[in-house]
Swiss-Prot record:
InterPro entries documented for this protein: Enolase (IPR000941), Enolase-like_C_sf (IPR036849), Enolase-like_N (IPR029017), Enolase_C (IPR020810), Enolase_CS (IPR020809), Enolase_N (IPR020811)
Reactions the enzyme catalyzes: (2R)-2-phosphoglycerate = phosphoenolpyruvate + H2O
Protein name as it appears in the record: Enolase
Organism: Synechococcus sp. (strain CC9902)
EC number: 4.2.1.11
Gene behind the chain: eno
Enzyme class at the top of the EC tree: lyase
Amino acid sequence: MIDSLDLVIDTIVAREVLDSRGNPTVEAEVLLEGGAMGRAIVPSGASTGAHEAHELRDGGKRYMGKGVSQAVTHIEERIAPALCGLSALDQAAVDAAMLELDGSDNKSNLGANSILAVSMATARAAANGLGLPLYRYLGGPLANLLPVPLMNVINGGAHAANSLDFQEFMLVPHGAPSFREALRMGTEVFHTLKDLLNAKGMSTSVGDEGGFAPNLGNVEAGEILVEAIQKAGYKPGEQISLALDVASTEFFENGRYAFDGGSYTSAEMVGQLEQLVNQFPIVSIEDGLAEDDWEGWKLLTERLGSKVQLVGDDLFVTNTKRLQQGIDNNTANSILIKVNQIGSLTETLQAIDLAGRSGYTSVISHRSGETEDTTIADLSVATRAGQIKTGSLSRSERVAKYNQLLRIEDELGSQAVYAGAVGQGPRGKA
């Protein structure tokens, strides 16, 4: 029998650690009265939306201004005294206490990185205190849906030093019978793609998210991915489709989109994306238009919303207020979920809940600056989101999430269901 006093928060410590880009980030440990401990590390993005919660950095010379010692101090000197004595089981109360302590709209006082590290560590401590895996603790008995992975195998934009304007070209192995088989299919295409790039004399160096970063145009990238899928023995659009993260805010200036040597209005940009959808087996487009181009997004949704998944990342920033605006205006049909965009686990779960109740899909996502923390793998199963974006099939901070999903699938045994096998997640276009 577990004593409820054993699940009370006793101690919180924090430290500065490194992310996958060699930049400092925040790690927190929450220790409970009964001895259980939870640890979490927060990620960091390169292409960040203007409406994201505030990530606190030190400035100055240390770590070229990117240190997080101030965030660590906030955890140990301000957050810890406020939370010690609270039950780790009451995630909403823990998160609410931190939001009240911060007092700002965007977590600029304590920093979203401080709040999120403690928020995630608290959930893990509670799960460990109860002897439950994190996905089961957060999701209950129905947490058995393994997500379709959106695998970023060609990197461009802000994630790579190459000529490719669009940020991510992804494989979507929705036609697999299980997550394990989906991972195998994606991995085989990844290695086939490497051979194709080598044969064409192109670079096989990788970007921040583990995908290749060759000098290609957007159409060429689509063509070589389709070729890789076929050469690996799979049917494009039937077994494996494509997804794009355009990250168009990155090349939007003065009301126009400048890429591939051209300059386009919002309507012309929609036309460009429509051409790509007609040319390739694309099932999902993320950030097809800029974060505040609401009129353009509305047009994009009218033109393509019935054909493909239209994911708002910079548009929604995991924020229920912006998501509600999109719902009210019939804008997009999916939300990208990044825990550090909003900065607490409770608010993340609220965004996923609002999306589901409104007929929007949710895609659980990593950031380009990642760590060995695997919380998002458990979160994807806990929330039955049905989709996860956690990079390519290389770099251990990406593979860590895939390996955790393999463990979860094994642990669930016959109860495990792969989202692609039951028609959830992006649909194929044979």
